[in-house]
Regions:
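Macromolecular interaction modules
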Residues: 1-223
């Protein structure tokens, strides 16, 4: 199974509310017609993401397909052409960032209705090979995160090896997804001793300790 993660920004002149409403209620009609979709999820940043400036993006889409052939067929379909045409209504397509990933579930709890999803966009430390980054994140760092007391669910989504070449790397190397029941649970977690240890461990495999993140409302559209 492959998961395509897309970071999208709203078109100039469109408010956050207008963007989210169109994406949530109108754009999904075009997405639903794509061939081969196994699952489709929208992540809508909550208002607090905009308090101190512009977040890394205005939305994160996650779309699952069986294999690379599925995505190739999807990209060549008439339905995908309609998706692209509809994106012009509300998305700044020049700023769109796409990464193909494989996901690993480290904490398989079920998200609660009304809960929040905390996304972190990870970039590996300079000089660290992709395979070494992914191994450390999964085998060493992941267990620290998965044991957090108030964590409901935890998923790692590293970029697939085929997304790298001698002269190209994706915009980010991985997406970390953590679910909590409430904002207060997230706040308490970030102020805890175990989370301080997680922050301290980042120097071993991440480029920056201060990484881009979003606090989101997750909306499962398909699957």
């Amino acid at each position: 199974m492959i998961k395509a993660i897309t970071l999208i920004k709203r078109k100039s002149g469109i408010t956050v509310q207008e963007f989210q409403e169109y994406w949530r209620h109108e754009h999904v009609k075009a997405i639903a017609r794509l061939p081969g979709i196994r699952r489709y999820v929208q992540n809508h940043p909550l208002p607090e993401n905009y308090v101190i400036g512009m977040p890394v993006c205005d939305g994160v889409a996650e779309l699952w397909g069986e294999d690379t052939r599925t995505f190739k067929d999807m990209a060549s379909s008439e339905a995908y052409q309609r998706v692209q045409a509809d994106e012009e209504q509300f998305i700044d397509r020049k700023s769109t960032q796409l990464i193909l990933t494989s996901e690993t579930v480290l904490n398989a709890g079920s998200p609660q209705p009304g809960g929040i999803k905390f996304l972190e966009f990870l970039q590996r430390r300079g000089g660290l090979a992709v395979e070494d980054f992914q191994h450390y994140w999964l085998a060493m760092h992941g267990p620290l995160v998965s044991k957090l007391a108030l964590l409901r669910r935890y998923v790692q989504s590293p970029a697939r090896p085929g997304g790298y070449s001698a002269d190209y790397s994706p915009a980010f190397d991985a997406l970390s997804s953590m679910w909590f029941d409430t904002r207060e649970d997230l706040r308490q977690t970030m102020e805890s001793g175990p989370y301080a240890a997680i922050i301290a461990d980042r120097i071993n495999f991440l480029r920056n300790e201060d990484i881009s993140n979003l606090i989101c409302e997750e909306q499962v559209i398909i699957g």
